[in-house]
């Protein structure tokens, strides 16, 4: 089951209370204080793990708490620290304050560990309060309460390439033939109800991650269809591949315009992201000469529109996932784009290090 949003209360452990205790030995009727300190409460720690792909482990849980610290004991024995609670989450998980919507943590890298809530400090035992005017203190500190916070965990998939298109345009078929992903494929809209990630091996040394996002429809940015729930997953893809279907009644140019508008309404940053265009189902030209001519005009109209708007797209390619034509070229084109983006990011990070 794919779960990408949960609301939950997280609480670190309370500190254990300090002990009130006195030495009890033969021939020492009024032994001094020997109360130990309480143990600190356990912490809440988030751990990012790329073997985890969903937030399903948090489904149905209203609260998770770290262990409380144990109380102090006599003979100056300190209480045991409460066990930390480590929460394993997938890459791309954000921890958001449920009241203010403030992003508290952003977990994006394998192995990333973040202390979220610190456990309460254990109280001091009565040994600490002995002084010249009070040799037998009969009080100790209570432990400090742990922290508690109501949060929302949101998963935004991280991928190199995100597939953007209307329902049933061939996105799932494409990712099934170029990667290790096995999405459900059928001839009806909204076959893909959850995002899918696939690893695309281009050659022995190069690969990238592709995300199949459920189909976008007009009005998605306002919540129509599967709407906002899945548009957010495109946010963390480095490169967008628009998948357009020549078999739809809507012309290719109009498909592209509508999809771009939905992205623009959702996020200006996403709208400005670099992208390519893939015309799917190129084998449909076999349906007849007249149909093939219509598709050619359709593609030409799209191409002219892109030139009119000085479009920054990197490439336009025709592909048939069923006949496996154009797939090799597509993979290499995408790889070149990803390499360029990775190098640009690396150079930017290096520049930042030098400036710092």
From Swiss-Prot:
Protein source organism: Campylobacter jejuni subsp. jejuni serotype O:23/36 (strain 81-176)
Subcellular location(s) per record: Cytoplasm
Keywords: Cytoplasm, GTP-binding, Hydrolase, Magnesium, Metal-binding, Nucleotide-binding
Record's protein name: GTPase Obg
Subunit relationships: Monomer.
Record-listed GTP binding positions: 165-172, 190-194, 212-215, 280-283, 320-322
Cofactor(s) essential for the protein: Mg(2+)
PROSITE patterns given in the database record: G_OBG, GTP1_OBG, OBG
Pfam families tied to this protein: GTP1_OBG, MMR_HSR1
Protein EC: 3.6.5.-
A GO BP annotation: ribosome biogenesis
Binding-site residues for Mg(2+), renumbered to this chain: 172, 192
Keyword Cytoplasm: yes
Physiological role: An essential GTPase which binds GTP, GDP and possibly (p)ppGpp with moderate affinity, with high nucleotide exchange rates and a fairly low GTP hydrolysis rate. Plays a role in control of the cell cycle, stress response, ribosome biogenesis and in those bacteria that undergo differentiation, in morphogenesis control.
One annotated GO molecular function: GTP binding
Keyword Transmembrane assigned: no
């Amino acid at each position: 089951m794919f779960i990408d949003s949960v609301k939950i209360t997280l609480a670190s452990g309370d500190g254990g209370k300090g002990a009130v205790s006195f030495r009890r030995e033969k021939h020492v009727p009024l032994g001094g204080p020997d109360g130990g300190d309480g143990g600190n409460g356990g912490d809440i720690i988030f751990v990012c793990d790329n073997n985890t792909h969903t937030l399903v482990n948090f489904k149905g849980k209203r609260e998770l708490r770290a262990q409380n610290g144990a109380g102090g004991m006599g003979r100056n024995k300190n209480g045991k620290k409460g066990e930390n609670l480590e929460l394993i989450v997938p890459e791309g998980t954000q921890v958001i304050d449920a009241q203010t919507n403030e992003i508290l943590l952003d977990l994006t890298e394998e192995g990333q560990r973040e202390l979220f809530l610190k456990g309460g400090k254990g109280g001091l035992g009565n040994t600490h309060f002995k002084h010249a005017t009070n040799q037998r203190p009969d009080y100790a500190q209570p432990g400090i309460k742990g922290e508690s916070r109501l949060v929302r965990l949101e998963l935004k998939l991280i991928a190199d390439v995100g597939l953007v298109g209307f329902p049933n345009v061939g996105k799932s078929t494409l990712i099934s033939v170029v990667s290790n992903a096995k999405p459900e494929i059928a001839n009806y809209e909204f076959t893909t109800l959850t995002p899918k990630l696939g690893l695309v091996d281009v050659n022995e040394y190069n690969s990238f991650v592709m995300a199949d996002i459920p189909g976008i429809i007009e009005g998605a940015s306002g919540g129509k269809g599967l709407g906002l729930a899945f548009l957010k997953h495109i946010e963390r893809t480095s490169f967008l591949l628009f998948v357009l279907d020549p078999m739809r009644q809507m012309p290719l140019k109009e498909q592209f315009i509508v999809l771009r508008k939905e992205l623009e309404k959702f996020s200006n940053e996403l709208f400005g992201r670099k992208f390519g265009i893939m015309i799917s189902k190129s084998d449909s030209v076999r349906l007849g000469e007249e149909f093939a001519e219509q598709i050619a005009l359709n593609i030409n109209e799209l191409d002219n529109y892109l030139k009119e708007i000085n479009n920054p797209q990197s490439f336009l390619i025709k592909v048939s996932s069923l006949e496996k034509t154009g797939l090799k070229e597509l993979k290499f084109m995408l790889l070149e784009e990803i390499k360029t983006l990775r190098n640009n990011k690396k150079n930017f990070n290096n520049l930042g290090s030098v400036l710092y």
